[in-house]
């Protein structure tokens, strides 16, 4: 009888534990305006644009700034490893990057600076305020976006000065 009571207690305990774990996993975070959804796999979906972004920029992943060629290599590595089980990551266009800028929101400050990063707080904190895009600008320069102003910048492709990137892909809800 005592053994049976212990067995029933253990079964009930593990059932409660399983239900709680499922609820925690099933509840995804959304931004205050419900536009961005944290997929809990290192990605964030944008319901307005249909784009899926990597939550943390390349600086937060690697701990160092990158130039434009390294940004392309970073994206290739995401695809080789199948980051979040996707193999179609790309460098964003300047237009895609600009969709992340929101003057009303402050994510954090750029690491090592007072520069405020104006993107949704669901994204990783204290990353780079300047992200490379896929758009080249002549032979030696490439474009990106600065997230304290939302402006497009053009810099030498070999410049690493406080620059990173963030992978993007087109998503559908039918993963």
Predicted features and spans:
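Bacterial N-terminal signal peptides that target proteins for export
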Residues: 1-10
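Bacterial N-terminal signal peptides
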Residues: 9-18
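Short, basic/low-complexity N-terminal boundary segments at the transition from targeting/disordered tails
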Residues: 17-34, 108-112
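Extracellular adhesion/carbohydrate-recognition regions
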Residues: 25-89, 164-168
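Solvent-exposed loop/turn segments at secondary-structure junctions
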Residues: 59-61, 96-98, 137-140, 151-152, ...
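An exposed tryptophan-centered "aromatic clamp" motif
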Residues: 72-88, 94-144
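Short, structured beta-strand segments at or near domain termini in extracellular proteins/domains
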Residues: 130, 156-175
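Low-complexity, intrinsically disordered Gly/Pro/Thr-rich segments
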Residues: 145-155
